[in-house]
Swiss-Prot record:
Cellular compartments per GO CC: cytosol; extracellular space
Site-annotated residues for Cleavage: D35, Y36, D70, S71
Residue ranges the record assigns to the propeptide: 1-35
Organism listed in the record: Felis catus
Entry comment on modification after translation: The pro-IL-18 precursor is processed by CASP1, CASP4 or CASP5 to yield its mature, active form. The pro-IL-18 precursor features autoinhibitory interactions between the propeptide and the post-cleavage-site region, preventing recognition by the IL18R1 receptor. Processing by CASP1, CASP4 or CASP5 induces conformational changes to generate critical receptor-binding sites. The mature form is then secreted and released in the extracellular milieu by passing through the gasdermin-D (GSDMD) pore. In contrast, cleavage by CASP3 inactivates IL18.
Protein name: Interleukin-18
Keyword vocabulary terms for this entry: Cytokine, Cytoplasm, Inflammatory response, Secreted
Name of the gene this protein is made from: IL18
Keyword Secreted in annotation: yes
Amino acid sequence: MAAIPVDDCINFVGMKFIDNTLYFVADSDENLETDYFGKLEHKLSILRNLNDQVLFINQGDQPVFEDMPDSDCTDNAPRTEFIIYMYKDSLTRGLAVTISVNYKTMSTLSCENKIISFKEMSPPESINDEGNDIIFFQRSVPGHDDKIQFESSLYKGYFLACEKEKDLFKLILKKKDENGDKSIMFTVQNKN
């Protein structure tokens, strides 16, 4: 059996160690791809914390969790239905997503400076970066079939979480606690 030639490979002409990391020097970089995220498709979703509270946008345009029956979710759809855009990731780190809401205007969740807020913007078609404040990695939680967690692509080890602050349950970004932190677990109910 003859070998079939492959045209999409990269020829390496050298190697070198820098600070205990092995780097390859490519013959030509025309086939190399930069790190990026490219938008694929989206889903309308309702997000809930482990107390079954629904994430919604309150009157102050802040993401908070509240007890809410399904009928209220439907009645308040622009504030409770989030648009989860999936992105192709040039690296394999989990499903890259943005979380947006179309309430008053299109806004996209950001964790800039580790503070959760909605930026008035539509998610871009592509992002030429390895990490970005609006990209999160959506992953299943081992041992919990229906639970999801969202890790920041910009701040490794930091996850979206639900935290009680005064009388509100707020969406925050926090460093994952290694002792089975349930505040970073969510259920995602897709509408389409």
